[in-house]
Amino acid sequence: NYSYHPLYKELHTVPWDTDVNITPYFTLHKIQGDVNKVISGERLGISVERLGISDKSPINHSSLIANPYFDLVYFDAFAPEKQPEMWSEELFRNIYACMNANGILTTYCAKGVIRRLLQAVGFTVERLPGPPGGKREILRATKTKG
């Protein structure tokens, strides 16, 4: 069981909003917050001017960060039936646009409709065994194009 590995434990105990060098080749910066604010740049402290948006209205889903930022997205929303606004094609398209090439999105929701939605926006999607004692399957979606 990999959950007892020291690196696994370290990943879960590092502070939020801080760069932490896990190994010489891996720096972790955990961001916790509303995914809409994160992908719009608001949560990252990116100004509307930096995004090149002339309109001073609030940033919405279509106002994406010009340069990808994320290598990994752990998507931990409630089930689509409980929180449907978190499972839209538009939201996943925007997350895809904010990810670096070969970036990975993972979610505990392994429903076929979500797998197809992730594929529709460009991810390559795999069903994987879930964690011990929990979900039977999870999804891993990889952005294979830059």
Task: Tell where the protein language model's regions lie, with residue ranges.
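S-adenosyl-L-methionine
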Residues: 1-42
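Short SAM/SAH-binding signature in class I
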Residues: 28, 68-77
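A short acidic, Gly/Pro-enriched loop at the edge of an enzyme's catalytic core
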Residues: 40-44, 66-72
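Intrinsic disorder
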Residues: 44, 57, 62-63
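Conserved beta-strand signature within the Rossmann-like core of class I S-adenosyl-L-methionine
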Residues: 72, 102-109
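Short strand-turn motif at the edge of the Rossmann-like AdoMet-binding core
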Residues: 77-78, 107-111
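A short glycine-rich, Lys/Arg-flanked "PGG" loop and its adjoining helix->strand segment in the class I
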Residues: 86-101
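Class I S-adenosyl-L-methionine
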Residues: 111-146
